[in-house]
Amino acid sequence: MIETTAGEIAAITGGMLHDCAPATPVAGPVEFDSRQVTPGCVFLALPGARADGHDFAAGAVADGAALVIAARPVGAPAVVVEPLGAQTSNSDAFAHDPDGSGAAVLEAVGRLARRNVDELAEGGLTVVGVTGSAGKTSTKDMMATILRTAGETVAPKGSFNNEIGHPYTVLRCTRDTRYLVAELSARGVGHVAHLARIAPPRIGAVLNVGTAHIGEFGSREVIAQAKGELIEALPDAADGGVAVLNADDPLV
């Protein structure tokens, strides 16, 4: 993540500082697992199936996190954002979020990630997006391996491709990063578009349109519409946008 301060994070996210000086430096990435915090990072207080990150926030700061992004005061340096209320999305990210606390934290980190990628793009960062019903992760891994021969490359670990994993990955980009390979998943129309707004791609690849999550989508045609949101997010060809499409799949 680009070096910043607590005050700047509050301004970017629309949150309020609690127990934290505006000039507090933040130089690390974001982390949602309190066991994985590193010095200077931002801990994300997210509710989960078995635990609530808010309960681990003070411990995360004690272990080195610079501050917490939370939906309520946590007794530690924090940027506090207002809960957004229950979400209607079928995303797994909101499965254990009855009051929208997690949604508010994710919206905040999405804004922070967008600021990060916008500033880095001015310095030459290229964002490559990949989506499809199957093969996203292996294709992402191959792309990243190839691009690393040309410069520092950031890509999701495993299948970090949703509302949590995507901004988490984006905020691992630094001023030395030349390429970001973003894997974009969806369980409904609008999901890919949302992820693309966080890190606008210049190159986009749609691999295929299959039947994964067809119960949520309703038909392959709707899945095709959702995957096509990646291409809609690209700049015009005259401005450097590049679409890579699977000509063997008629729905692509």
Where are each of the predicted segments found?
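Phosphate-binding loop of NTP-binding sites
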Residues: 98-247, 251
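Short, basic phosphate-binding NTP loop
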Residues: 2-129, 139, 143-145, 149
